[in-house]
Design a protein with these regions (language model features):
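C-terminal alpha-helical "lid/dimerization" subdomain adjacent to the S-adenosyl-L-methionine
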Residues: 38, 43, 163-222
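Class I SAM-dependent methyltransferase SAM/SAH-binding core
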Residues: 64-122
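Conserved class I S-adenosyl-L-methionine
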Residues: 3-59, 74-78, 180
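A short acidic, Gly/Pro-enriched loop at the edge of an enzyme's catalytic core
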Residues: 121-133
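A generic alpha-to-beta junction signature in SAM-dependent methyltransferases
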Residues: 57-59, 82-83, 156
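A short glycine-rich, Lys/Arg-flanked "PGG" loop and its adjoining helix->strand segment in the class I
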Residues: 146-158
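C-terminal lobe and adjacent flexible extensions of AdoMet/dcAdoMet transferase-like proteins
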Residues: 222-236
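A short SAM/SAH-binding and catalytic strip from SAM-dependent methyltransferases
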Residues: 132-144
Length: 236
């Protein structure tokens, strides 16, 4: 029985390894077909985009960081190994993604990363507990985007940083068509989506003037700082 359990665990590990490699090939453009997909459909370099997003967080960051959705941690693993003074929580709704990320955490020895399955629309955390929230290519997949934005704002400390990127409509007709005909039908994307202008307006309405945005093909890259609470007369 012990041998059977070990064999089953090995098969499961090998299965997740194959899934991780295929998924990562698609995202990173390691294969010719994935490079065609990223260039022809999206007209973007996901590796460059990921580097630009992660550069918004310093390697010497100290504090608690929430990564939602963590995905397979393909783009963040190397960064997190350098962030030795950070306490990082990776959350994803998909148990498969969590399993793949756990395999990467183990094989690449990312000691400061903990992984949890959960819903961004109902984050299982107290108010104002994170110093930074990272969300890379997540919002197009969130069914309840308003709740996701509100929950991230709730768990972020005043003065904390919210950064990442997500798909915006109206920038590239081929990408918009692919989203509607393929990604939505497969359940990978969930409407509605903001235009770039709408995304910028939304972020400014929540975070005020301390908002930076950049358009990269059909993606909005952003960095926001949550305003400090205004002190009351009793606190002064």
């Amino acid at each position: 029985n012990i041998l059977d359990k070990k064999m089953m665990a090995n098969r499961q590990s090998n299965s997740y390894q194959r899934m991780m490699e295929h998924y990562d090939d698609l995202l990173t453009g390691r294969k010719w077909w994935s490079r065609i997909y990223m260039r022809f459909i999206w007209n973007e370099d996901t590796n460059l985009l990921a580097r630009k997003v992660l550069d918004l967080i310093p390697d010497d960051f100290r504090g608690r960081l929430l990564d939602v959705p963590v995905g397979t941690a393909i783009f963040t693993a190397e960064k997190y190994r350098r962030m030795k003074d950070a306490e990082i929580v990776g959350l994803d709704y998909s148990e498969e993604m969590i399993a793949i990320a756990a395999l990467r955490k183990e094989t690449e020895e990312i000691a400061n990363l903990s992984l949890e399955q959960g819903d961004v629309g109902e984050l299982p955390y107290a108010n104002e507990i994170f110093d930074c929230v990272l969300s890379m290519n997540g919002f197009q997949a969130f069914p309840e985007k308003e709740k996701a934005f509100a929950e991230i704002f709730r768990v972020l400390k005043p003065g904390g940083c919210f950064c990442g990127c997500f798909y915006v409509k109206g920038e590239r007709r081929l990408a918009d068509l692919f989203v509607k005909k393929v990604m939505e039908r497969k359940g990978f994307f969930h409407p509605p989506y903001d235009t770039f202008a709408e995304a910028e307006s939304r972020l400014r309405s929540m975070y005020g003037d301390d908002v930076l945005t950049e358009k990269m093909a059909s993606v909005c890259l952003f960095r926001c700082v949550k305003p400090q609470r205004e002190s009351t007369e009793n606190e002064q």
